[in-house]
Amino acid sequence: IDLRAGDYEARVATTGATLVHLRRAGRDLVIPFDAETTLPCGWQGRTLVPWPNRVAGARYTYGGEEYLVPCNEPETGSALHGLVGWSDFQVVSDTAGEDDPAGEADVDDVAEEAHEPLSDVTLELSLPASYGYPWALEVSVRFALDAVTGLTVTTTATNVGAAVAAPHVPGAPEAAGEALPAPYGVSAHPYLTRSVPLDECVLTVPAATVLDADPATMAPAGRRPVEGTDWDWREGRAVGETS
C-alpha cells in the first residue's frame, strides 16, 4: 500500500502492519526492503502487539496465574515481540471515498475513484484468545502521512473479552468472578537511517525518566530520572558520544 503527501512517501505491508519504507524527497528515512519478494531483517518495520521485547522463559505471571507463550527465540528461551508480527491485517481506508458497507475497502479502488494518491490507511486485525494469552483484542494501526509533519502511526487495541478456560484447564483469567483487564504493550520496529554513519546522528528524546528492566525476567523494574545518567537525551547529542 503506497502513501504520499508532499515530499513524503511510504509503503505499508499488511503482514504484521509493517512499515516497508519511508522517504522524503527521495531520501530513505528507514531502511527499506522489498516486502513482495524478500523476508525482512528480523522484525524490521513490524507492529509489536500485545508485547514488545522479550518475555523471559516464554512465561509470565499475571493475576496470580502463570501463562506460557510460544518461544520464538530459542537462543534466549524467550517469547519475542508479541503475537501479530506475521499475521495478515485487513485494510480499511478513510482517505478517499466512502467506507465499504462491509467495513473493508479496496485501497486501489478508493485511490482510483479519488484520482489522487492515498495519504493514510488503517489496518485492522482480530487477535483471538489463546491459552498463553486468553484475551481477545481488536487491533487497529493507522499510518498517516502529512506534507509538513511526516508520518504518524497510531495503534489502538480494544479488549473485547477474556476467554474463560474450560473447567479442566487451569489459568482462567478471572479474579473474584470477573474477567481481568488484558496485560498489554505495544511498539514498532523501524530501522532508522539518514544515509550517514550512525555515530554522527544527533538523537533527541524528550523523556525525563527511563524505565529499567529486571535483568533476569526483563520485566519493568521501575522508573528513575535520566538527569546525570547516560540516558539523558533531552538536549540532543551525537549517538557516538555515548557508551
In which residue ranges do the predicted regions lie?
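Active-site/ligand-binding surface loops and adjacent short beta/alpha elements
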Residues: 163-168, 174, 179, 183, ...
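Residues that act as N-cap/strand-start positions at coil-to-secondary-structure junctions
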Residues: 6, 16, 54, 83-85, ...
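Acidic, contiguous internal or C-terminal segments within carbohydrate-active enzymes
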Residues: 10, 125-167, 171, 178-184, ...
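Beta-strand-rich N-terminal accessory domains
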Residues: 1-74
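Extended, loop-rich substrate-binding clefts of extracytoplasmic carbohydrate-active enzymes
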Residues: 72-100, 108-148
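Intrinsically disordered, low-complexity terminal tails and inter-domain linkers enriched
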Residues: 95-118, 159-180, 212
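Acidic/His-leaning functional-site neighborhoods
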Residues: 8, 78-92, 229-243
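Structured soluble/peripheral alpha/beta segments that form catalytic or ligand/cofactor-binding pockets
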Residues: 63, 70, 74, 79-80, ...
